[in-house]
Amino acid sequence: MTVTSPTEAFPAPGPGGWRRLADHFPRALTAEYQCLYASTCPPGMASYMERYGVVARTLDVAVVRGHLYITPVPLAGPRESRRSPPRALVWMLSRLHPAFRRRTRAARAALAARPWRAVTDHWFTVERDEWRRRNTEVENVDPAGLDATRLADHLRACHRLVTSGYLRHFELHGDDLLPVGLLIARCQEWGVDPALASGALAGASRAPHASEVSGWMLVTGYDLDCLTWNELGDTAGVAVPGHPHPVDLRQHVRAEHHAELAVLVADACRAAELRDDNGAITGAWPMGLLRRAMLAAGDLLCPADPTLAVEATVDELVSLLTGAGGLTRVELDRRRRQRLADSALDAPPAIGPELAIPPLDALPRPLALIGAAQLAAADHMLGDGHPVGIGTDCYTGRALVVDDPTVAMDAFEPGDVVVTAATSPSWNTVLAHAGALVTATGGLVSHAAITARELGIPAVIGDPTACRRLRTGATVTVDPINATVVTLGD
């Protein structure tokens, strides 16, 4: 049940306009995950933004009532502006300010050399195997057989792995998201709608073979309270058995742009493949290993309910295991109850003033194009509060409104319209037999949108009222062309 919250319950955590990452985190976050995200996202994003000439220093991160919010940190000027800066000022600043001049050079070099290609090649030929070896080394240590001192050491090792993995994941966003944003941004300049442009990515996601999937990968979400494949029982749902048909955009773009279009589509498809692959290996797998170690600590410290351990930070668990004291079970239980209460709140999608985007056409062309790509990637990952459609055919069927994939497996009937807040890989088994998909969060390049394209099922993504408005058992029509979901008989 979602509890409507007054605006004052979610005060702005700082200057600027803050957007909630609801598609990734529909619930309030654990204490350790809050620390992890805040320590890795800003430096990782700053690295790629500097490398590729993005007109921002980084993303800042804040947690309000347990919910994660982000805001861009401007390259120069105040953190908060109530209106877009004058075009003449942007034109002058971008050509005279040393920071803008450096970013323009970086953007020009990136657009000429397209370095994300080399990064992607290196990932699949070298770096991927290195990360798999690192993960396997940690996985081969069974925490259940360790005494308290050795378990504390293992927790530290898991924490180091997770921290380095998340940092690398954010650094790679310049390579696994910007090319997708470039495709969408250029297509918009050619008059092609983003929903149509993103259809060219169908089939790009790499479906891993079951032998490549560790049972200790987190799969029902990103936080430490989520389950691994081993806890679900098997990895049968990891692959999406679809038959996608990518959209041929050439018929929508003038012939003189076809050569550039081919490059953009190829780069975006490789980027989508990189994003899905590195997210599992640098994020889901290390996080699952950390969860396993924390639950082992819970077996020693609170055997009546080992899952309370995920409410602690790694440092707090290490202190308890090494005899330094600290948290009590009462405090862990209080944290859990508070997190569940915060999860039930209707956290606003945005806090503070609307982001004041500078006029991109006042920037030097390389800076403007990279800026448009960054905005497109961000907007179509998170969504903008307006639903978007995937597919071309309407579908009518029984609605199943559910927020847990394990519950969905028991209640699901083939052909159902699955209605949920957001999806993760654990939904794949259900969605492979669904008639359509509706989510309350996300955009054109969210996990839900990608999965719908791979499966060839119609979807409406990012309808913020869907989970409240629709009811299980009702007959609904999903119309991806108009991005609407209607209950028949209303």
Predicted features and spans:
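Contiguous hydrophobic, helix-prone segments at protein termini
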Residues: T2-V388
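Alpha-helical context
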Residues: L21, R83, A262, A266, ...
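Phosphate-handling DNA/RNA-contact segment within nucleic-acid enzymes
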Residues: A368-G415
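Acidic, glycine-rich flexible loop/linker segments
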Residues: M1, A399-D416, A421-D490
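Short, flexible coil/turn micro-motifs enriched in small/turn-prone residues
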Residues: V61, W216, D384-H386, T392, ...
